[in-house]
Amino acid sequence: MNGELIWVLSLLAVAIVLFATGRVRMDAVALFVIVAFALSGTLTVPEVFSGFSDPNVVLIAALFIIGDGLVRTGVATVMGTWLVKVAGNSEIKMLVLLMLTVAGLGAFMSSTGVVAIFIPVVLSVAMRMQTSPSRLMMPLSFAGLISGMMTLVATPPNLVVNSELLREGYHGFSFFSVTPIGLVVLVLGILYMLVMRFMLKGDTQTPQREGWTRRTFRDLIREYRLTGRARRLAIRPGSPMIGQRLDDLKLRERYGANVIGVERWRRFRRVIVNVNGVSEFRARDVLLIDMSAADVDLRQFCSEQLLEPMVLRGEYFSDQALDVGMAEISLIPESELIGKSVREIGFRTRYGLNVVGLKRNGVALEGSLADEPLLLGDIILVVGNWKLIGMLAKQGRDFVALNLPEEVSEASPAHSQAPHAIFCLVLMVALMLTDEIPNPVAAIIACLLMGKFRCIDAESAYKSIHWPSIILIVGMMPFAVALQKTGGVALAVKGLMDIGGGYGPHMMLGCLFVLSAVIGLFISNTATAVLMAPIALAAAKTMGVSPYPFAMVVAMAASAAFMTPVSSPVNTLVLGPGNYSFSDFVKLGVPFTIIVMAVCVVMIPMLFPF
């Protein structure tokens, strides 16, 4: 063992210890590695910074942007809402659908992001079903990890291994090369969790969050006595409202009808359009109306204006919470609007929002509020577009936002662009499948289109990239080059050959899986893939077999981080909400990791012959 190899292995040991202790940020450790290699002269400057020019680093950054675009447009949130409706109160159905949904979404966006989105969904469902969240949180994390086995772009380790294949002059994996293995693991994972979830006792009730919690739409509806006031009315052809401006119709004065928004068909889908005083109505528009006057004859109103009552699900537009927001505001002492009524202020025209409730001295006022003077200390309930509510809250000149309901966390800043986001995702996958356009270029095209369609803006795009992950990959890549230059890879391959080389390639697959899984207990799965990929390819070359089975087993083992709560950020996320201990992950993670290893040893040679 030469001096340079001892230096590289020592540096690797230091990095692993720092990763394992968690006292130093992982990206800081990666930068330390870059500096150490550059100053020691072990690698040339181009070799040290080769990670920054790696196409897969660009691809990973682009995938962060695409994933955030799916979040901002509400695609993931809508999936969560659908999941709750379909599963009902069945724990088995919820577990199966949860794992299928998370694995499906995680195949195209960050598994950590998907799991973060579904944690509040799972907590809500657990509370409603009066079951322990621990029975669903572990399946959630397992599904997030399994999603990394569903497509080539699902997780950075897959791309790292693919990059090593390309660097060695081989063809890379196709987009769905890993999918058959992932599907089998997913099915086994669902069956495994259906049986083993009973080992996760947890608390019988969902742990309550400490301190102040936000109220919900339902709380505000009850406090301001809004029950029974909401209506959905469709404008029939020939209605006198067609082509008329809202202010000219005087609906509030004549019928006590306050138009909150309009459902309108736009590009083959129904969207909710915000309204103001100059908004004009069209045939077949569906009006979302707050009827503040209890004595108004709804039948007469519909007859005179040729309106057709429509079904309204949920209480007071709660089913439209992704588009229609609600907030409590109050006048500030310096406001010039104190003493003026809603009508005098021109509230809807000025702010694009509707005043539907007013509390004075803790008591909600009833009836029409349009001519009620607003006093200092009044709490005003406004309804309208979430974006406009946010603008009013930030304005700070006349009003201060007192309370935004819990549903604000589900609102998506670009909800109306969800079809465009899905189109961009499908286009990216299609371009990757053609093999005519490089994967990073296909991802960048999708990012540009998301920007064009306003699924995401430039500032949000840069913020969505998880730069510590990018720096970690870039900083660990020089290790692969250094181990090859100094003979470290050859030494590792010799050790593997001594252990399992005489028993054939199947045994070597098992050895590579075990080694990758063990290393993954101490460092991130991405760093594991960076270190193990060159060793796997060198082992294949030594044995005279195809490199693809060995490369694939490293990618799969890197995603099989089921054994400890620190093996992956996905596990760490559910640790608290699930009220788990370290032993919970060990007793469920170790057996399932062995199952995944068995699947890989059997299936990989079938898909990628030696």
UniProtKB/Swiss-Prot annotation:
PANTHER family: BASIC AMINO ACID ANTIPORTER YFCC-RELATED (PTHR43652), RESPONSE REGULATOR (PTHR43652:SF1). The chain crosses the membrane at residues 1-21, 29-49, 51-71, 78-98, 102-122, 136-156, 175-195, 373-393, 425-445, 464-484, 503-523, 543-563, 588-608. Its main location: membrane. Disulfide bonds: none annotated. GO terms for cellular component: plasma membrane. It is a multi-pass membrane protein. Belongs to the CitM (TC 2.A.11) transporter family. GO terms for biological process: potassium ion transport. It comes from the Bacteria. Pfam families: CitMHS (PF03600), TrkA_C (PF02080). It is found in: Cell inner membrane. Keywords: Cell inner membrane, Cell membrane, Membrane, Repeat, Transmembrane, Transmembrane helix, Transport. This is Uncharacterized transporter YfbS. Residues 218-307, 314-398 form the RCK C-terminal domain. GO terms for molecular function: monoatomic cation transmembrane transporter activity.
